[in-house]
Amino acid sequence: SSSSSSASRALPAQDPPMEKALSMFSEDFGSFMLPHSEPLTFPARPGGQGNIKTLGDAYEFTVDMRDFSPEDIIVTTSNNHIEVRAEKKP
């Protein structure tokens, strides 16, 4: 004869579900907010300010690059960040 026990076991505590990360293809991408405590600055130009505008479901940002030619400017994206660097080519 077989016996079965129906001991109740406590389920392990589960972490709350992770929030969906925003990406440029996400419906929530337009809810981007710049932190109030950190103004938009550019390390290569101390105190230099940029400008970001919301245009419908897109963003436009401007950076003063007048000292550089187009081939000196490098734009990369990674992890929901855009990086604009300028390096003078010899």
Swiss-Prot record:
Interacts with C-terminal domain of actin-binding protein 280. It is found in: Cytoplasm; Nucleus; Nucleus, Cajal body. SUPFAM superfamilies: HSP20-like chaperones. InterPro entries: A-crystallin/Hsp20_dom, HSP20-like_chaperone. The lineage of its organism: Eukaryota, Metazoa, Chordata, Craniata, Vertebrata. GO terms for molecular function: filamin binding. It holds the Pfam family HSP20. Its main location: cytoplasm. This is Heat shock protein beta-7. Found in both cardiac and skeletal muscle. GO terms for cellular component: actin cytoskeleton; Cajal body; cytoplasm; nucleus. Disulfide bonds: none annotated. PROSITE patterns: SHSP. Belongs to the small heat shock protein (HSP20) family. Residues 39-90 form the sHSP domain. It comes from the Eukaryota. Keywords: Chaperone, Cytoplasm, Nucleus, Stress response.
